[in-house]
Swiss-Prot record:
It comes from Homo sapiens. It is a single-pass type I membrane protein. Residues 295-307 have a biased composition (Polar residues). Residues 481-715 are cytoplasmic. The modification Phosphothreonine is found at residue 614. Pfam families: CUB (PF00431), F5_F8_type_C (PF00754), LCCL (PF03815). This is Discoidin, CUB and LCCL domain-containing protein 1. Glycans are attached at residues 64, 124, 277, 351, 418, 455. The keyword Lipid biosynthesis does not apply. Residues 152-248 form the LCCL domain.
Amino acid sequence: MVPGARGGGALARAAGRGLLALLLAVSAPLRLQAEELGDGCGHLVTYQDSGTMTSKNYPGTYPNHTVCEKTITVPKGKRLILRLGDLDIESQTCASDYLLFTSSSDQYGPYCGSMTVPKELLLNTSEVTVRFESGSHISGRGFLLTYASSDHPDLITCLERASHYLKTEYSKFCPAGCRDVAGDISGNMVDGYRDTSLLCKAAIHAGIIADELGGQISVLQRKGISRYEGILANGVLSRDGSLSDKRFLFTSNGCSRSLSFEPDGQIRASSSWQSVNESGDQVHWSPGQARLQDQGPSWASGDSSNNHKPREWLEIDLGEKKKITGIRTTGSTQSNFNFYVKSFVMNFKNNNSKWKTYKGIVNNEEKVFQGNSNFRDPVQNNFIPPIVARYVRVVPQTWHQRIALKVELIGCQITQGNDSLVWRKTSQSTSVSTKKEDETITRPIPSEETSTGINITTVAIPLVLLVVLVFAGMGIFAAFRKKKKKGSPYGSAEAQKTDCWKQIKYPFARHQSAEFTISYDNEKEMTQKLDLITSDMADYQQPLMIGTGTVTRKGSTFRPMDTDAEEAGVSTDAGGHYDCPQRAGRHEYALPLAPPEPEYATPIVERHVLRAHTFSAQSGYRVPGPQPGHKHSLSSGGFSPVAGVGAQDGDYQRPHSAQPADRGYDRPKAVSALATESGHPDSQKPPTHPGTSDSYSAPRDCLTPLNQTAMTALL
């Protein structure tokens, strides 16, 4: 072979190898870029109107030469709210490393480096494309983004902590997807959480919201405690915490009480295990020992293999349909038996129905709950939405060594009016089909105990009863007041405003008394003077007098002696001593009283003195006036009053002026005889004729002396 030919072939082979290397060098970046397109996205959870998105490896350093591009949406007609919880991109020029938001009409960004980035963006659209691109860099966490619709202006990011807020009470909206975001929490749902804990992550731990759904939270900030105990709940591990100045708690719907059930008859299991202790005695791990509050070993299944053909289960009968919002579980609780269930699913049913499996609200798949990680510590899982059923089964999926469970159900009774405790979907787009019998119902089962709206009856009946009671009370009060007013002895209020004295209505009438009335002169401490009166008490009894003002006086039990009006011919039926306007239907005004007198009977002698100085001789008759130097003798056997000053011939003088026939008493028939005897000294003691008792009545205001027989009988 010619040497030149051999050299040409070698050159051709070398050129071919170089061309192949060049092609590989050119195609490698293209292939790498194709593989990494969209591979720069990290944590991503989206729901109907909220979600969370991060760069890859967040909060670690994001990889080189990656691209993350996603489109996020909220319901049409709503505006989109974006909040950047964290943005750390190394590039300063945004040439190869940046974060960009693009909508159909606007562009927001790019953002990178140390640029001032708004914490919140309110977009005029319901859809936006998020693009994150990275080049060659050394450090940088990337970004954390949360979003929600404009229905939730109080949106916060997954990185918000309670220490960021000063208010003692506030409400915020947590987006979906905060459970797996890096960050610690300390505390539990009973004692509260340390104020350095992430708010949304703590809300998931407490069972207030579901991670895949997000939701509204209400926070109460309180004084801190010395130690915070951490537990595992709803897939979130809470750590033990130290003393802090403040802590926070969540307000719940009140349906978080322990549901009681009896160990005998209300708990069943697919099988149970019997062990032998060190002393050779058998230990029965029966279903009745599955209550969390009971001491001793738990329930354990009879088969310890990991390949159970029929599923093992623990069934609880609550006695009636109840709302179940959560479950607490532990393992064997025995240190020498390290048994516990690592994961499980829930089945439930009601009377005469088939068993249903609890499924997730988003993907409509059988929901597997995270169980215990040791035999001792309790773990809590919440059902969002709650289970409404009478029978519940815990079906273990994975376990350690042997299935062993202690269980406590959390929930409340179903009553009319607690419809607010029922979780509702925010949209119909994620409704779950329930046509098949073996599918779960992700909302409470409609029943006679669970109302689907505001129960009008529970509102209307109390209102009607309240109105009836109010009207009944008003009627009773009006009737009582009317009766009291009608039976009042004081007349109407209108009558009391006339500035006149009114006669009080007596509730009863006194009967005539034939007894003697005795009065005493207490003021002058004189010897007892006896004034014997036999008359109708109704004529002498004087009504109480009440003025229209604040002054109230009590009158004497004897009628006043001022009869000027009578002597003047004025009728007592027409008016009193006061010119007071009369109204139709009104009673006669009472006569005015003399100067105030004591409540008991006024002494007769004092009244005589008053009459003697008050009434003139023209009044028609005179009354006797006692002399200071004379006394009535009660021991002499007679009664001889001495003539008073101003008397002509005797103690009594008959009326001189003739009065009309319609006087208050009958006229004497034997006037001439009395007139003849008036000049005789013996006229001091007027004679009493038996025959005149029928034709003559003594004036009401005159005194009738007693005869010797009456005085003797009295003494």
